[in-house]
Amino acid sequence: MNAPMQPVAHNPAGNKYVEETRFGFWFLQSHVWQHHVLRVAINDLKGLLGQPLPEGAVLLDAGCGQGKSFRLLQNAFAPAQLMGLDADPHSLTMSRAEAEREGLPVQLLSSDCASIQLGDASVDVIFCHQTFHHLVEQEAALAEFWRVLKPGGWLLFAESTQFYIDTWVIRWLFRHPMHVQRTAEEYLQMLRDQGFEFGPQNVSYPYLWWSRSSDFGLLERWKLVKPKAVGQRNETLVNAAVRKPL
């Protein structure tokens, strides 16, 4: 087997996160990412939230990457102000170009998630999609989310679990800090430990074809095996809409 793909550039945030490989950076521009991963997650999180944003809402995309989420977030939630945060300068350059292409006035922040350059209680909603499995300081990042969220604010959290990240195909094509990967329940417990509130109606466990690297769901599609229910399988993804109490 070949060695893992090499990272695309120097990591300006030091050891706080593990950046994408060249393949990963390309993949974040792909149709599969935009339509089968990002769009699906945003639609699911909107359902888990189950209510419109408050008037004049500020929405922060924490780990915005190349900005492919901006139009989807604007259409789904209609925030009054949309912000994007990323620690990678090249990604921010692409995010800026994407915002201009979409005609969206997105405020961009050059920062990692563990040290957000925003004031306390300044954001109504944080969207954090497929970012935490790159972060080394996960608890510190979550504490920053808590700090910048207003009381009653929401964190829309979508992550891949260790049962997806720790597979041969992902290890080959991508690069992650393996020692901090978590199960779905461990991610949810981390959110609880920070103080976020949520119920079963705010959580989903998507079992999407691309997250099952053993067969990519083909055996189920060909009806060679029966799909397993939640609780009978190793969850590969977890989505949650969690609230900072008033």
What is the predicted role of each segment?
Residues M1-L53, L72:
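Conserved class I S-adenosyl-L-methionine
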Residues Q66-A114:
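Class I SAM-dependent methyltransferase SAM/SAH-binding core
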Residues V180-G195:
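Short alpha-helix
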Residues E139-P151:
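A short glycine-rich, Lys/Arg-flanked "PGG" loop and its adjoining helix->strand segment in the class I
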Residues F23-F27, E102, P200-L246:
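A C-terminal cap/extension of S-adenosyl-L-methionine-dependent methyltransferases
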Residues T161-P177:
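Short, glycine-/aromatic-enriched active-site segment of Class I SAM-dependent methyltransferases
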Residues G153-E159:
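Conserved beta-strand signature within the Rossmann-like core of class I S-adenosyl-L-methionine
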Residues A114-V125:
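A short acidic, Gly/Pro-enriched loop at the edge of an enzyme's catalytic core
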